[in-house]
Amino acid sequence: MLTEFNSIPATEAEQGIVSDLVRTLGPISFTLQQTADRIPTIWIDRDIVHAVLRHLRDGATRRFQMLYDLTAIDERQRVHRDGLPKSDFTLVYHLVSFERNDDVRVKVPLAEGALEVQSIADIWPNANWYEREVWDMFGIGFAGHPTLFRILTPPTWTGHPLRKDYIARATEMGPYILTEEKERAEQEALRFNPEAWGMKRHSENSDFMFLNLGPNHPSVHGVFRIILQLEGEEIVDAVPEIGFHHRGAEKMAERQSWHTYIPYTDRIDYLGGVMNNFPYVMAVERLAGIEVPSRAQMIRIMLAELFRIASHLVFYGTMSQDVGQLSPVFYMFSDRERVFQIIEAICGFRMHPAWFRIGGVAADLPQGWDRMIRDYLGYQSKRLDEYDKLVMRNRLFKARTIGVGAYTLEEALDWGVTGPGLRACGLGWDYRRQRPYSGYDQLEFDIPICHNGDCYDRVVVHIEEIRQSLRIIRQCLDNMPPGPYKSDHRLTTPPLKERTMQDIETLITHFLNVSWGPVLPPGEAMVSIEATKGINGYYLVADGDTVSYRTRIRTPSFPHLQMIPLISRGAYVADLIAIIGSIDFVMADVDR
């Protein structure tokens, strides 16, 4: 039985949420948990999950409109669980309210012999994929789910990889031998069965065609398969199939130190560079209690915005190519090369510098950095004006994108859309403005919005974000504060080398942090940022060790791709190519 509300000290936000639940649902049992991220965290019994989440979405005074994330934790080997309900596996629902600019985390304890709860796919449609992922990775079932199939691993996979008793290294497996019989079985498992997805093979007038688009197709932007149900060339329905790029990024975190996992984050949104490091190191710093110096914060912002520009240029060029223009993609990749020259001069690497550190950045800015950036700022602004004439005013580009792939603001919130895709529907919500981090509150920039939510508007928002990133970088250039580029906190990694020969304590700390990695105190924290493709967050569970007990990577592209059937029904295959291009995703960000 869980603890009653009045016996637990609660924040004002928790008081309001729980009091609202009690008024509506009557007496309920729950536990309140304090976390390092200060997000109200409420444990409830599995029998009332559906009712509680339904109320938080539809009946609360200020609704939590978005299911931001849904994941699980295998608690069986966790040591530090004082004051928490007994649980073998824990479901974690993370909701966001844009009205109150607040979050709530709902946790559900499950016993190993009773791993099933009611599905919430009827409340939030984006829960469909999240629940499939939890089933695939942990073996937790969801009663009433329409298609509870594996999603990141092949249909023939055995076991649930994010369980603690599942092996973490390929060297722990036996040799892999692909016999002809096994190859045929694997291929047969990939055969699409329309009935399993609730699809009909025939209409009243004709037979439907089922077309595989991908996984090897240049217009699906990665190893990604969409099964299209067609009547003629019109799309009746679609089934996106992901997982071909899954590499076990979350599992890898359980065997890397807090420091050595940083390069792995670069490979999630592989066009975002250090933008991937940002939420991870901030989550570690939140757990460790590290305060980052102002110079390091400003350097982080500047590098993140440079990578935002680089990523958006790839989007702009490939989107124009997808709808029939060839020249722009070459021009924009040339511009991205200029950005990479600056990044390489500062970080030493181009696409994946892994340059952020726990407590700061890897090194101070090199001599002449300001001149390189100042030259680039003047160059890129003029190029954007030329691209506007070349692409955005082109009547064929407009014909292929205006009114195509549109969704409403309500649909965007239901499906978990964030970033440019959300702002294209008219909601000017940007993490850098609404919940500023790393010093963004000291900078002036606008939040571009549109109102039609179609392919064209999504491109417009991306372009205007490039202009705002240039504006932010100029302010970083003109107002870079003096001071250290790394915190002197004892858990900063690597620690300051200068102090190692002065006293024994810092020498010991340096040795331990470099050889074993820092030991973080037990706790939990979710830190999110406004990344290139939407809101990206890292949910870390520390158990007093040198490695993460659980690392959850919440990426924007995962829910975005799930919308494809909704916005492609009734369109043509050619329209689908424009729709896919306008979403702005990479498959590593989806599959992790």
Swiss-Prot record:
The keyword ATP-binding does not apply. It is a peripheral membrane protein. Its main location: membrane. One of its GO terms (cellular component) is plasma membrane. Residues 207-592 are annotated as: NADH dehydrogenase I subunit D. In the N-terminal section; belongs to the complex I 30 kDa subunit family. The keyword Cell inner membrane applies. InterPro entries: NADH_DH_suC, NADH_DH_suCD, NADH_Q_OxRdtase_suD, NADH_quin_OxRdtase_su_C/D-like, NADH_UbQ_OxRdtase_30kDa_su, NADH_UbQ_OxRdtase_49kDa_CS, NDH1_su_D/H, NiFe-Hase_large. It catalyses: a quinone + NADH + 5 H(+)(in) = a quinol + NAD(+) + 4 H(+)(out). Keywords: Cell inner membrane, Cell membrane, Membrane, Multifunctional enzyme, NAD, Quinone, Translocase, Transport, Ubiquinone. It is found in: Cell inner membrane. NDH-1 shuttles electrons from NADH, via FMN and iron-sulfur (Fe-S) centers, to quinones in the respiratory chain. The immediate electron acceptor for the enzyme in this species is believed to be ubiquinone. Couples the redox reaction to proton translocation (for every two electrons transferred, four hydrogen ions are translocated across the cytoplasmic membrane), and thus conserves the redox energy in a proton gradient. It comes from the Bacteria. Residues 1-183 are annotated as: NADH dehydrogenase I subunit C. Its EC number is 7.1.1.-. GO terms for molecular function: NAD binding; NADH dehydrogenase (ubiquinone) activity; NADH:ubiquinone reductase (non-electrogenic) activity; quinone binding. PROSITE patterns: COMPLEX1_49K (PS00535). This is NADH-quinone oxidoreductase subunit C/D. NDH-1 is composed of 13 different subunits. Subunits NuoB, CD, E, F, and G constitute the peripheral sector of the complex.
